[in-house]
Amino acid sequence: MITEAIAKIVKGENLDKEMAAAVMDEIMSGEATQAQIGSFLTALHIKGETIDEITAFAEIMRKHCGEFTPGVDEEIDIVGTGGDCAGTFNISTVSSLVTAAGGGKVAKHGNRAASSKCGTADCLEALGVNIAADCKVSEACLKDLGTCFLFAQKYHTAMRFVGAPRKEIKIPTVFNILGPLANPAKANLQLLGVYDASLVDPLAKVLSNLGVKRGMVVHGNDGLDEISAVTTTTICEFNDGTFNTYTLDPTAYGFTLCDKAELVGGTPEENAQIAKDILSGKITDGKRTAVILNAGAALHITNRISLEEGFALAADILANGSGLKKLEDFIAATNA
């Protein structure tokens, strides 16, 4: 099937969902050769991926991932595609802890660093979280603490078949955006940051196709795959199949914009310290604003409250230290 798909794509033809699913199934099953995978990914990148193709690929990735049963009615993932080359601290990781402290259920899916010095897994590991915790431990953490971490390497073992071709062709591929769409918990709420504004509306539709009920796809207009504390952010918010694209300006909510340099992180150890200093209230600069914006948006989604209320709740959590307590409980639970 993959050879037929390559032949169609090089002619500029799109794949229907059935063919796209069949090709991804071949890749994830180890049936496709590395040459075929490299050719397919290159041709697809040149043609450009459609909503149906991305949806089908993500569905098959989910089928091949390890089992995880959330045990809660609604759970959110707060995640970015990466690829913005900004080198920020782990904004979504800290925001996830704040969201959990505010009552949201957060199934955080992530990996080690790809385009930066420190990925979610690296930061959590440096904080003392057991990132390779047993599935049952993670299920209990989500249910009892409101947060868990699902290590991509642990759940997506079939990705070993695409590692070498991706490294060798050295171009962006559809897998750059598939990771955030393939959460093993199949989170039905999502705050997804993307590295390119052209992905905002299409990926909102993909998430809806995948069964995500409510969420936001965001792109900072400074290039960040987060809600930006530096400038405005383009957002596509969706709710049960209804889509609304708008621009969020932090100054309209009383925030002072910061310089991009304020958001820069470093090594896993440095980012872990930044996380603790934000959660304990020691950091009050643009890093804090970035967390309030992103955690507040997540709480808007999970708690069905306004953005203003979400931002206020996130600020209260940072002020009262409950986010730090959530981290401490999370560390203890994963190492029990």
Which ranges hold each PLM region?
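Short beta-strand segments at enzyme active-site cores
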Residues: Q36-I37, A107-H109, V217
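A glycine-rich phosphate/pyrophosphate-binding beta-strand-loop-alpha-helix module
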Residues: L41, F89-L145
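Gly/Ser/Thr-rich beta-alpha loop segments that engage phosphate groups in nucleotides
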Residues: N14, D84-C85, R112, A121, ...
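Acidic, glycine-rich active-site loops and adjacent beta-strand->loop/helix elements
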Residues: G80-C85, G110-S116, Y155, N221-D222
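Acidic, glycine/proline-rich low-complexity segments that act as flexible tails and inter-domain linkers
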Residues: M1-G87, V98, G102, L257-L263, ...
